[in-house]
Curated annotation (Swiss-Prot):
Gene3D superfamilies named in the record: Ribonuclease Inhibitor (3.80.10.10)
Domain LRRCT stretches: 137-175
This protein's record includes keyword Ion transport: no
Keyword match Glycoprotein: no
InterPro entries reported in the protein's UniProt record: Leu-rich_rpt, LRR_dom_sf
Protein name: Leucine-rich repeat-containing protein 51
LRR repeat positions: 50-71, 80-101, 103-124
Gene Ontology CC: axoneme
Major location category of this protein: cytoplasm
Amino acid sequence: MNKRNYMNTSVQEPPLDYSFRSIHVTQDLLSEEPRTGLRPVRHAKSGKSMTQSLWLNNNVLTDLRDFNHAVSQLLEHPENLAWIDLSFNDLTSIDPVLTTFFNLSVLYLHGNSIQRLGEVNKLAALPRLRSLTLHGNPIEEEKGYRQYVLCTLPHITTFDFSGVTKADRTTAEVWKRMNIKPKKVRIKHNAL
């Protein structure tokens, strides 16, 4: 990416806000008007939004099919997307498409229907992820939920709207040593 096309993600623009729009599929974003806030979202000459935040909370999304396509149609610089709010939808898994946004630092997934704790592993591919929410999903009931997430994502500083402390990290490491067994390597012997 050249410097001319790079947007400073430290400058916080208002979000592109599609919350409370009864959106069922991501393609609906292209025909739906975003909510207006106190400050208007800036647009490029192309008509696309210049924001780094996309809010899709409180809708009825069950998957993120065509998410990349919709985002590329809405944002001038989709590669700079830093905040995605998908809270209070009906997502049952963490779609790998989210891992394509390498600048993602805030991801809200609370209040969905994510059932497998192993889904969190996908988010380890996001090097800048610092804030994550998953509470209100069935995985929250899993034994060791917080420790598992903190072990899997050691760079996050806020989890479920609570700061991650040194004590949390220590507890997570102890939990990991007690609960996550290293995979045994099987050696195959060729029969002669």
